[in-house]
Amino acid sequence: MQHTRHNNARKLFSEIDLNPQNYLIIHYSCESFYDIKDGHTPRITSIAVYAYATAQTDSFSIHKVAEKSHIQISDIELHYDELEKKMLDEFFAYAKEHSNFFWIHWNMRDINYGFKAIEHRYSVLGGIPYNIPDEKKIDLARQLINCYGVGYAGHPRMEKLLEQNDIKAKDYLNGSQEAAAFANKEYVKLHM
């Protein structure tokens, strides 16, 4: 069983390497889902999509939408739903335009954190999300486990992988740091 998962993951990594023009890498930042007491879904602050073949990044963020709307960063909270809706309008238009791509992500697989969470949030704000089909989503975290087994890196795995490979991640924030940046209204930090 593990041997089959390992081989399938290796084939997938080879396919990505041979055809990078078919792959996008996505990450997003949101309000902490652990600190919400009233039951609302976490607000999305930014989404970054990196084209693997060209190394170009398209980003969708609250502070950029605020700037285009002539709203000061200090006033974002007063207009958050409106700005978030505009940001997600842009993101879902982009997703629809890139429907033929595969989306590589890290643990974005449920309603708490993932594509479903972004779709739900957009629906709450009155939008109609474009649904990226599950067969177009590649969970890199899961594929690394498939390839190397559960013990390939300690927890938190992303940070441990950075350490193991001596990678200095510029502007990297872990989940709790992202949540703190949101709470402190440091929206630009969440965009990086």
What is the meaning of each model-derived region?
Residues Q2-K116:
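Conserved non-catalytic scaffold segment of RNase H-like nuclease domains
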Residues R43-T45, Y50-I71, F101-M192:
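Metal-dependent phosphoesterase core characteristic of DEDDh/y 3'-5' exonuclease domains
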